[in-house]
Amino acid sequence: LRRVSLDLVGLLPTAEEARAFLADSSPNKRDRLIDDLLGRDIDYTEHWLTFWNDLLRNDYDGTGFITGGRKQISGWLYEALRQNKSFDAMVRELIAPPDAESFGFIDGIKWRGTVSVAQSLPIQFSQNVSQSLLGINMKCASCHDSFIDRWTLAEAYGLAAIYSEEPLELFRCDKPTGVIAEAAWPFPEIGQIDPAATKQERLDQLADLFVHPENGRVPRTIVNRLWGQLMGRGIVHPLDAMGTEPWDADLLDWLASDFQQNGYDLKRTLRLIVTSHAYQSSGDAVGGVAEGGNYTYNGPSPKRLTAEQFVDAIWQLSGSAPAAFDAPFSRGVVS
């Protein structure tokens, strides 16, 4: 009860909820509890907003960027989660924004002063879309052919050129090469970008490729992230290295296929995971890492409360939640 409440809505169950759950002898009480939690749209949204803010680099609000240079997507993201917008629709609106509400993700951060070429807006675009949505770390490849993965400088710049308004010269370790990048998608088996198209057309083509029915990379990446968030460790680990061998490839493929075939429904996939025996089993305090480094799943890994969960728990237990806030909010004050 405590685990699933914190995982799905970020809040501890109340004493009344705990007593009612323990007194309920019906065999489907866990399923009903999970459906009730997922139906608490505001609590669900405000809890999972933290996960998506981190993933989409929307939590950055420091002073390093030029004023007005980057628009956060908080309003769009909040509504997408509250409405349980399908993930493929979210991806389309992030990659090829239909309006200003979701532009912040691809626009990146305009740093003050002179910065490395690897921090230019087109390269940030390449790094962000590949890491967040494909589980690919393009940061090394943005400077030189990666030493730790298969990705090359040309592939990193190929993605960057999709976004770039101007011809984009490849720089290796901040030194110009004289080579102009050609807009390209790194998985040509399912299609390719037309380099001669306009920027908006290229972004539309890229969005189509991200949600292509034969693109298994995107659904695998997001279900692996959801599994990792709930279980403490992904089926593929690290989460941003999807080229790593999964500890159970069949499980990953099945979850990704189910996700695709059922409308990219995030809540449905969360429900699928938390109703499983794997999630509801006893926690694994040692983390499942056996001698030699091989991972064996022995149960969910214990997780610390997040900062948000900790504050909410203190407010809930002490009855000290603020009576007024300095910004609009939707979550009810716990009494």
Where would I find each of the regions flagged by the language model?
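Cell-envelope and extracellular/periplasmic
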Residues: 211
